[in-house]
From Swiss-Prot:
<comment type="subunit">
    <text>Homooligomer. Interacts with GORAB. Interacts with COPA, COPB1 and COPB2. Interacts with AP2B1.</text>
</comment>
<feature type="domain" description="Protein kinase">
    <location>
        <begin position="14"/>
        <end position="314"/>
    </location>
</feature>
<dbReference type="Pfam" id="PF00069">
    <property type="entry name" value="Pkinase"/>
</dbReference>
<dbReference type="InterPro" id="IPR016024">
    <property type="entry name" value="ARM-type_fold"/>
</dbReference>
<dbReference type="GO" id="GO:0005794">
    <property type="term" value="C:Golgi apparatus"/>
</dbReference>
<feature type="compositionally biased region" description="Pro residues">
    <location>
        <begin position="18"/>
        <end position="28"/>
    </location>
</feature>
<feature type="compositionally biased region" description="Basic and acidic residues">
    <location>
        <begin position="764"/>
        <end position="774"/>
    </location>
</feature>
<feature type="region of interest" description="Disordered">
    <location>
        <begin position="592"/>
        <end position="807"/>
    </location>
</feature>
<keyword id="KW-0813">Transport</keyword>
<dbReference type="GO" id="GO:0005793">
    <property type="term" value="C:endoplasmic reticulum-Golgi intermediate compartment"/>
</dbReference>
<keyword id="KW-0931">ER-Golgi transport</keyword>
<feature type="compositionally biased region" description="Basic and acidic residues">
    <location>
        <begin position="741"/>
        <end position="754"/>
    </location>
</feature>
<feature type="compositionally biased region" description="Acidic residues">
    <location>
        <begin position="632"/>
        <end position="656"/>
    </location>
</feature>
<keyword id="KW-0175">Coiled coil</keyword>
<feature type="region of interest" description="Interaction with COPB1">
    <location>
        <begin position="792"/>
        <end position="807"/>
    </location>
</feature>
<keyword id="KW-0333">Golgi apparatus</keyword>
<dbReference type="InterPro" id="IPR011009">
    <property type="entry name" value="Kinase-like_dom_sf"/>
</dbReference>
Length: 807
């Protein structure tokens, strides 16, 4: 009965958008936007209303419905679903836009690039080649109205209404009856000439020539306009002329047309087309080919269309990471494409992959993530950072690779604002204490101090009181000169976090001791910091009512704003991820290394002390704490220091990594120190003021004194101590040499709470080790020369009687 009947359109799983139809092509179909009811995903719906008086058009529409349903090709409009009733036909395809509408919209936004047009035409020609050569079908409707563009910018061939078989089955081509479409018919169809000698692709290739003309010049007014190429690129004109030639026999096959355009210098021979062709076949490519492709992809992404990167490159990158073996090379193009996404898309597509990557054991993957953290840190929420990312990142502090340890330290600058109380004030501080005390690489100890100065404002008040003074005081005793500079600047950058009592009793005594440091850069920074702290104390002394205002931040809760103010004093930018030591190591690696070998203790009595080694321009302070009485030399140092933020932190992973591994005395010193600990368990350095922490994570001084070697006979000197190339050095270049002797002699006689070490013992042992190594090399060289002489004598054979050979 009729009231039990159901409306098939209402039960259809897709619904039409209420918006008016968009640019429907000429023909029986009307194009609507739509969506899937279950998921809301966008689709395109072609609708044909059956009319009793248009039976011929109805048959054409049903034939097109059948063709589109059975034909599957990447360059042909993708069929999703369909509905056929007595009243209408619905064909659901992927979401597309008519080419004419797409070109008009892009022209208003600046126009399409030739790269996009070359790939779009490549796709249409490839679809024609599939139809004609593989399916023996003639499209018979190639024009602007039959081409559609998806959201990735891919061109799709549609308009299959008038398709027929090239083998003659089923009669001739169907009649169109639409003037807008018949104007693209080749001339031989109009006058009936040349039918017997034309190829099966001749008519479609003529229509392809019309499409090319319209793409570059706009709508075709009449067939005679094809004689003028207009704006068609010069590299495409010769091949275009073959398409619109009067003789149908000379029109090329679609496959040969593609081959001609892909030749060197051809219109379709470019990086964009090559990238698309590789992506189409990426599933069958070798792993080595994929690695090379992804490595080179980042350079080309800047010239590629944004929609193409978002909707075609990004899915391939995600698939390659999840199911392939691409590894770390995927990260650079992945984050580059991520810039085109909004916050919601980034959370859905990129962040799950990033979180999964942090659990990888691949070192290359981990260091790439740390280096590029600045690009995605803003999209990470605090629970994700604390539960899924930080537990994996902290493993980098214990890694044997110095580059990973350094990058892990630098990443804390970005993670600190998102860490919870436990991870920031307990877990992270333990690792920082271990690195600053035990790491054998001077730049890593220096960068740890730099990072601590930048994140100091995020720490709780109790942690700041317990950690900052201890850590920066330890840094001022480091034998690596940039670390001592970092300690001084750390005090200055966090000056608002100390009470006046701490400034007077803890900080100023440490800074005053640095005024006789062997390195001028350290002395300069120490004097600046002393003046700034003294000015605060003096202002409070003159007006005690200012004490509350000056100490307002001492017991305040952690505040990012405080960190920004502190960082500006030393020119540190949180978003810039700059390194204090990068300039010293990258620009002057030999000078930076020499600092670790400069004697930090005076020479034996009666021997001339070596002159202090000058260092490159080191960071100086700039901002409200600078005084007006600074000298011209100090101002020049300040201008050089302002460029810290322009430097890169990548110091260890490049040339300095190999040099430091060979020459840094810290490796030798630590090995000797650990050997001394193993032989004498009772020999332990005193704990620092931060003694409440576990031994592993406290700021106690863990650098042990090696047992001093037997002293040489009086008056003897090592060969390395002589100045072979010039006059004997004197103390004139260093006016504080005498003061330094007394100061350091006093430091040897007592043990303060920071566990000061005898760095002279380390250096003496290092020099002896180098002398022993040189002696062994000489002995080995002598043995090699003797062996070569023996081989030469044996090769000459026995000497003859009565003769004498001279060797």
């Amino acid at each position: 009965m009729w009231f039990f009947a159901r409306d098939p359109v209402r039960d259809f799983p897709f619904e039409l958008s209420p918006e008016p139809p968009e640019g429907s092509p000429p023909g029986p179909w009307v194009l609507h936007r739509g969506r899937k009811k279950a998921t809301g995903s966008p689709v395109s719906i072609f609708v044909y209303d059956v009319k009793p008086v248009a039976e011929e058009q109805t048959q054409v529409a049903k034939a097109a419905f059948k063709r589109l349903k059975t034909l599957r090709h990447p360059n042909i409009l993708a069929y999703i679903d369909g509905l056929e009733t007595d009243k209408c036909l619905h064909v659901v395809t992927e979401a597309v836009t008519p080419l004419g509408v797409y070109l008009k919209a892009r022209a208003e936004a600046g126009g399409l690039k030739e790269l996009e047009l070359s790939w779009g035409l490549h796709q249409i020609v490839k679809a024609l080649s599939f139809l004609v050569n593989d399916c023996s079908l003639i499209h018979n409707n190639v024009c602007m109205a039959a081409v559609f563009v998806d959201r990735a910018g891919e061109w799709k061939l549609g308009g299959l209404d008038y398709m027929y078989s090239a083998q003659g089955n089923g009669g001739g081509p169907p009649r169109k009856g639409i003037p807008e479409l018949e104007q693209y018919d080749p001339p031989e169809l109009a006058d009936g000439s040349g039918r017997a000698v034309r190829e099966k692709w001749s008519a479609d290739m003529w229509r392809l020539g019309c499409l090319i003309w319209e793409v570059f010049n706009g709508p075709l007014p009449r067939a005679a306009a094809l004689r003028n190429p207009g704006k068609i690129p010069k590299s495409l004109v010769p091949h275009y002329c073959e398409l619109v030639g009067a003789n149908p026999k000379v029109r090329p096959n679609p496959a040969r047309f593609l081959q001609n355009c892909r030749a060197p210098g051809g219109f379709m021979n470019n990086r964009f087309v090559e990238t698309n062709l590789f992506l189409e076949e990426i599933q069958i490519k070798e792993p080595a080919e994929k690695q090379k492709f992804f490595q080179e992809l980042s350079k080309s992404l800047d010239s590629f269309p944004e929609d193409f990167c978002r909707h075609k490159v990004l899915p391939q990158l995600l698939t390659a990471f999840e199911f392939g073996s691409a590894g770390a090379v995927v990260l650079t193009p992945l984050f580059k494409v991520g810039k085109f996404l909004n916050a919601e898309e980034y959370q859905q597509k990129i962040i799950p992959v990033v979180v999964k990557m942090f659990s990888s054991t691949d070192r290359a993957m981990r260091i790439r993530l740390l280096q590029q953290m600045e690009q995605f840190i803003q999209y990470l929420d605090e629970p994700t950072v604390n539960t899924q990312i930080f537990p994996h990142v902290v493993h980098g502090f214990l890694d044997t690779n110095p580059a990973i340890r350094e990058q892990t330290v630098k990443s804390m600058l970005l993670l600190a604002p998102k860490l919870n109380e436990t991870n920031l004030n307990v877990e992270l501080m333990k690792h920082f204490a271990r690195l600053q005390a035990k790491d054998e690489q001077g730049p890593i100890r220096c960068n740890t101090t730099v990072c601590l100065g930048k994140i100091g404002s995020y720490l709780s008040a109790s942690t700041r009181h317990r950690v900052l003074t201890s850590a920066f005081s330890r840094a001022t005793k480091d034998p690596f000169a940039p670390s001592r500079v970092a300690g001084v600047l750390g005090f200055a950058a966090t000056h608002n976090l100390y009470s006046m009592n701490d400034c007077a009793h803890k900080i100023l005594p440490v800074l005053c001791g640095l005024t006789v440091d062997p390195e001028k850069s350290v002395r300069d920074q120490a004097f600046k910091a002393i003046r700034s702290f003294l000015s605060k104390l003096e202002s409070v002394s003159e007006d005690p009512t200012q004490l509350a205002e000056v100490e307002k931040d001492v017991h305040a809760a952690s505040s990012p704003g405080m960190g920004g103010a502190a960082a500006s004093w030393a020119g540190w930018a949180v978003t810039g991820v700059s390194s204090l030591t990068s300039k010293l190591i990258r620009a002057h690696p030999t000078a930076a290394l020499a600092e670790t070998n400069v004697p930090q203790r005076p020479a034996p009595e009666g021997l001339p002390a070596p002159a202090p080694t000058p260092v490159p321009a080191t960071p100086t302070t700039s901002g409200p704490w600078e005084t007006q009485e600074e000298s011209k030399d100090t101002e020049e140092d300040s201008s050089a220091a302002d460029r810290w933020d322009d430097e890169d932190w990548g110091s260890l992973e490049q040339e300095a990594e190999s040099v430091l591994a060979q020459r840094d005395d810290w490796s030798t010193g630590n090995q000797a120190s650990r050997a001394g600990q193993a032989s004498n368990p009772g020999h332990r350095s005193q704990e620092s003021d931060w003694s409440s922490w576990e031994a592993e994570g406290s700021w106690e001084q863990d650098w042990q004194e090696p047992s001093p070697p037997a002293p040489p006979p009086e008056g003897t000197r090592l060969a390395s101590e002589y100045n072979w190339g010039g006059p004997e050095p004197s103390d004139k270049g260093y006016p504080f040499a005498a003061l330094s002797v007394h100061r350091e002699a006093g430091a040897q006689s007592r043990r303060d709470s920071w566990g000061d070490d005898n760095w002279e013992g380390l250096e003496t042992e290092s020099r002896q080790a180098k002398a022993e190594l040189a002696r062994k090399k000489r002995e080995e060289r002598r043995r090699e020369m003797e062996a070569k002489r023996a081989e030469k004598k044996a090769a000459k054979g026995p000497m003859k009687l009565g003769t004498r050979k001279l060797d």
